[in-house]
């Protein structure tokens, strides 16, 4: 099997350009895919259920008399949960409990409650926090079925207080993933439709005779789903358009190289475009990691995917020191950042941009993917510079509260009218002045 590992040195004159080449990734904007998604969305918007049925038959080879027949009842979800092998069910329930506990803590700590304060003249200002009414969760089907994603998308919505959670999941050839359905049961999903693709996004965004329109759509999907989510944004909210998975490992050379190699594999096995990078000041340790990669690769069931990912977008980078490693990490702004060092918190203080930070050699990224508790839906493609993990805050909205007292209207009215006249908006000014007149005449 062909495996070419790119090895860079930050001391080289051309390092900056080499790093940019490693990081270069433009999300595929295939015009044919975008046109196809647009056509499907337009069809669903006009014809509703009929369009959903036709596209589901065409793409998933599932024939149904009605969209209602594609909805799974709570009994079916419970049966999927009850049918799990006991240790698998226990693991799923334990993961769900940890994800729920973390997001309940997040709800308390992250400004998800209403607040207000009163000024001296009696004017009250504040903010009203309200959960979204209805959220749609897209869950990939077939080989890319991830029950952990059901937990990570549905549980924060439920903790936030979303009234209704609608899940869509394709079942190619009519084959259901029982673990995904069991996860939906545990996470508290209200309704599940076995539809997917752009047609499912359209059904959630616009609503059909059977599928209710939602306020926000979250969850990963293929290129057609991504194109559809881009197009319906504005009609509904979306979480993000995620790129390929990424891991960046900063290591001081004190971790077992086999552990580091497997951590790099953990993202490389997702797909050929996934990115795995190691930053380390110890050239000898980097050589040990490379040897471990080559030794362990043949034992991996997805070795072809891993090899393609590491050859195409991976890198082993020698840095001058750990300080420089942190600087480079901030520039990369990775989805997952492992700091595998003896004193990880010392270096974590220097990190400004990362979707999730995994501290210490015992904290493998895979623990965060499944059961640590924090959300595994993370910003990719350097968007961690301005974006955050999916959380409870993504399922709430904020309304400003303004209750002006009679005395407050006198003071604020003078300010507002002066500024409004300056902008040439006489009605704005007059509206404020009416309150002044009423206050002075009454």
Swiss-Prot record:
It holds the Pfam family Histidinol_dh. It is an enzyme of class 1 (oxidoreductase). Pathway: Amino-acid biosynthesis; L-histidine biosynthesis; L-histidine from 5-phospho-alpha-D-ribose 1-diphosphate: step 9/9. Substrate binds at residues 245, 267, 270, 336, 369, 423, 428. One of its GO terms (cellular component) is cytosol. GO terms for biological process: L-histidine biosynthetic process. The keyword Oxidoreductase applies. Gene3D superfamilies: 1.20.5.1300, Nitrogenase molybdenum iron protein domain (3.40.50.1980). PROSITE patterns: HISOL_DEHYDROGENASE. Its EC number is 1.1.1.23. The keyword Cell inner membrane does not apply. NAD(+) binds at residues 138, 199, 222. Binds 1 zinc ion per subunit. Coiled coil: none annotated. The active site is at residues 335-336. Belongs to the histidinol dehydrogenase family. Catalyzes the sequential NAD-dependent oxidations of L-histidinol to L-histidinaldehyde and then to L-histidine. This is Histidinol dehydrogenase. The gene is hisD.
